[in-house]
């Protein structure tokens, strides 16, 4: 069984076995009746083929040792029946008749279509190779001359100089029979069309032509996004510097959507009403403000400074016994 066929299911296999058992049972009963009531001279312990031969001899048929069967009074057929082709030599006494005609229509002409671009048409054209008038004239003459050979086909189905049968393998001299070669001249390709025809990839961005951006002017104020407005221009500076930057005019935003942090300064909240409140403008107690000198730096709470109070010599390694601590 080839790999392209479908495997039968379990139920289908069971049905096939059941039908085969029934056929064998019927055939066994038929041959049993022929053996019992046929009065044939059969050899001892013979198979069913001998019973079938005796039945054919009684009915007027001759069965050769190789299985060739034909009627009495007729000569043995010269050629045996071809199972695949379905054709055999015609015999007046044979039990089978050959097919009167083939199942396909023979091609009246060649299987190649004539076109003005073909090499065989070069001698039919005139001096002007671009003109189609000589080709149309030759097409009409070809169709009229071959109409008699295709009388079995309707006029609207006939293809002049062609075939409606299966395609024929081209000869070795034909360009279509050769292996197609890959074009290695990559310099002649149009890169702009090659890039635009490629589907976009998450890991590769297509850079369009520079002419697309020739007439585009980037605005100074761009709609704010959370990634730009979370970090101020001077995140660890004083409040006065942020206020002076806001009063001096609106800041310009860099066109770097992939960057964040201090590389892309944010618009102060005074210039952009939709922006989030920066860290320096947030309302917080003065003792927790970073860099403020009013109350000093934030002191550590109890238990934070562990390594500063005890030296390395005072530490003692124990096994967890409370009495040795």
From Swiss-Prot:
The keyword Transcription regulation applies. GO terms for biological process: brassinosteroid mediated signaling pathway; DNA-templated transcription; regulation of DNA-templated transcription. Pfam families: BES1_N. Residues 6-89 are annotated as: Required for DNA-binding. Transmembrane segments: none annotated. It comes from the Eukaryota. Phosphorylated. Phosphorylation increases protein degradation. InterPro entries: BES1_N (IPR008540), BZR (IPR033264). Keywords: DNA-binding, Phosphoprotein, Transcription, Transcription regulation. The modification Phosphothreonine is found at residue 169. Residues 1-21, 304-325 are annotated as: Disordered. GO terms for molecular function: DNA binding; DNA-binding transcription factor activity. Belongs to the BZR/LAT61 family. This is BES1/BZR1 homolog protein 4. The gene is BEH4.
